[in-house]
Amino acid sequence: MYTMASTPFVLYGGPGSGATPVHAALTLMDLPVKVVDVAPWQGEHERGRLSAVNPMRQVPVLVLPSGEIMTESAAILVWLADRYPAAGLGPHIDDPTRAQFLRWMSFVSAAIYALYWVRDEPSRLASSPEAEATVLERTTERIAQCWRDMDAQMPRGPRYLLGDRLSDLASVEKLEGF
């Protein structure tokens, strides 16, 4: 419905990763997409597969029809919402809900999603099995607290975060299984 080109987007990622809400947004926008399943949390081989498209070796990676490469879930989702405004997955720059949209997109990405990098592989920050267990416990607690903090600040009554319309953040919340 919103397709501007026949060249598909190429999305690198796996189920449950930051690629999930990007894939949902592309699907809701009816944009052509080729999905390349890659799970960097499964080890060096998988991270190596990402090297050519993302030197940081993380997902999601979205290759635009122009060949340009984008990374970072929030950046991709905001770009898609801005590039395809008719899809209604994010408020227009002049919309009164735009500030909250950007606030919560950034919060989820920086305060919550970033913690999964630690939680998924505690050995990145811990030097012993005991320390890994502590890191895992504390990151899991912090993730839950961030969701509680966000929930406490949500307006009551509207169906979605920004009122009665679906937004990118609603996709993240529902599809990431938080």
Across the structure, where does each feature detected by a protein language model lie?
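GST-like fold's C-terminal all-alpha helical module
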Residues: 2, 105-178
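GST-like domain detector, emphasizing the conserved glutathione-binding G-site
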Residues: 2-134
